[in-house]
Regions:
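Short, low-complexity, charged amphipathic interaction modules
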Residues: 1-26
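Active-site histidine-acidic residue metal-binding/catalytic motifs
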Residues: 32, 37-123, 147, 154-156
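Loop/turn elements at helix/coil->beta-strand transitions in domains of secreted/extracellular proteins
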Residues: 50-51, 100-106, 131-138, 185-186, ...
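Active-site-adjacent mobile loop/cap segments within catalytic or ligand-binding domains
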Residues: 54, 140, 144-147, 191-255
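Solvent-exposed loop/turn segments at secondary-structure junctions
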Residues: 59-62, 110-115, 143-149, 165-168, ...
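Extracytoplasmic/secreted envelope proteins and their assembly/folding machinery
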Residues: 88-95, 118-121, 157, 169-177, ...
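Mature extracellular/periplasmic domains of secretome proteins
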Residues: 117-134, 204-209
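Active-site-adjacent substrate-binding region
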Residues: 169-197
Length: 255
């Protein structure tokens, strides 16, 4: 009988010890959770401006001309160039780069066929009316030509255009020029300093009629054989894309 009582007492002691251990572990877990809940989280570093960026890819697959002299002639297929196709490829890469960094960027034209300038302008101005013209910018991507594209020409270089007069577009062009001068070392940068800045001024419909800051870039001459080789090269494409992406970001950070 005495042995049985001793066994019962020992079992009771073990049960109490186990309950004490379990309670201590539960308290430790509670304290740990409280500590985790009280951790100071890093502040958000998202300082991206709330600006809608439109990237316009000039022309369409039904736009006449707009091709290099050798295109479709089978002379040197590696020098075939169709502006609408190249514009879209570059615009898509600019879009992807900015989108990947969290910017609100849109492709103005997603159709393959040429969309009228009036419709392009309407799309931009509709957004301007929704969010405010100071919250929208437009960059229209093109490649230049000195003639009809049937013969090789001597004209070369990169340039950007704004509408006539002093406008907020001039500032956007200024940042694009700054990047072009860094990225296109040894290549011609075409400027017009007659009005005190580097960009060229023109009454291009898409610049004159949009309500927001707008710049049209002419990314070298596709009817100059040296310029064409450059913009068809991996390095040339990379630098054209980088110029637009960095120029846009630097402009947005400055306004």
């Amino acid at each position: 009988m005495k042995k049985i009582l001793e066994n019962i007492i020992n079992l009771f002691k073990k049960k109490i010890q186990k309950e004490n251990v379990d309670n201590m572990q539960e308290e430790d877990n509670t304290l740990e959770n409280n500590d985790n809940n009280n951790e100071i989280m890093p502040e958000s570093t998202n300082n991206i401006p709330e600006t809608v960026i439109y990237i316009d890819n000039g022309h369409g697959n039904d736009t006449p001309g707009k091709r290099s002299p050798y295109s479709s002639k089978g002379i040197k297929p590696e020098l075939d160039f169709y502006e609408y196709k190249w514009n879209r490829e570059i615009a898509n890469e600019i879009y992807n780069s900015l989108k990947g960094m969290g910017y609100d960027v849109r492709l103005l034209v997603t159709e393959d066929n040429d969309i009228s300038l009036k419709e392009r302008v309407n799309r931009v101005n509709k957004m301007c009316s929704q969010v405010g013209k100071d919250k929208v910018i437009l960059v229209s991507v093109h490649s230049n030509a000195a003639g009809s594209g049937s013969e090789w020409k001597d004209a070369r270089g990169w340039s950007a255009y704004t509408t006539k007069g002093t406008t907020k577009s001039d500032k956007l062009a200024e940042y694009l020029y700054a990047e072009a001068e860094k990225n296109f070392k040894g290549l011609k940068i075409r400027t017009d300093k007659s009005d005190g800045d580097k960009d060229w001024e023109s009454d291009f419909y898409i610049l004159k009629n949009t309500n927001c800051p707008a710049v049209l870039t002419e990314n070298f001459f596709y009817d100059n054989i040296e310029d064409l080789k450059y913009i068809l090269s991996d390095e040339g494409r990379k630098m054209v894309i980088k110029t637009h992406v960095d120029g846009i970001i630097n402009y947005l950070n400055a306004i």
